[in-house]
Amino acid sequence: MAQAPEYHYVGSVDYQPTRPSAHQNLIELYGLTELAKKVGRVDEFGNKRKMRRSYKAYIQDLPGYNEILRDNTIKQWLTNPIREEVPIDIEFLHHVFSVEPGIIPGFNPKVFGLEDDVVMGNVSRDSSQPRSPSRRKK
């Protein structure tokens, strides 16, 4: 029995790699070598330097707001939540979470891959009977 030949797809579209590449030295590429030496934790000889408390002197000439303020809002919300009683109307909950037969307002059959000729829309009918997607326009 003869084997079927193997076919391989050969693409005809050439893709250009993005620039800059992650394989490049980005610090050197963008001219940040001197800054990296100044603020680096380890000097060129491998000795550890004292950690600087602030980089503010290096970024003051950049536009924008350069000072980060401590914000403990989320921490306060988590540690001391405001607990207040909220009245719950049980009848309202039953109304909003109830499911009734009929067409869903704003339903788009194309989202679920249903055929375009499925009858959906505002047609007067008995709302107690759900509309079947198999009913077609004539």
UniProtKB/Swiss-Prot annotation:
It holds the Pfam family Rox3. Its main location: nucleus. One of its GO terms (cellular component) is core mediator complex. GO terms for biological process: positive regulation of transcription initiation by RNA polymerase II; regulation of transcription by RNA polymerase II; transcription initiation at RNA polymerase II promoter. Coiled coil: none annotated. Keywords: Activator, Nucleus, Transcription, Transcription regulation. It is found in: Nucleus. One of its GO terms (molecular function) is transcription coregulator activity. InterPro entries: Mediator_Med19_fun (IPR013942). The keyword Oxidoreductase does not apply. The keyword DNA repair does not apply. It comes from the Eukaryota. Component of the Mediator complex. Component of the Mediator complex, a coactivator involved in the regulated transcription of nearly all RNA polymerase II-dependent genes. Mediator functions as a bridge to convey information from gene-specific regulatory proteins to the basal RNA polymerase II transcription machinery. Mediator is recruited to promoters by direct interactions with regulatory proteins and serves as a scaffold for the assembly of a functional preinitiation complex with RNA polymerase II and the general transcription factors. Belongs to the Mediator complex subunit 19 family. This is Mediator of RNA polymerase II transcription subunit 19. The lineage of its organism: Eukaryota, Fungi, Dikarya, Ascomycota, Taphrinomycotina. The gene is med19.
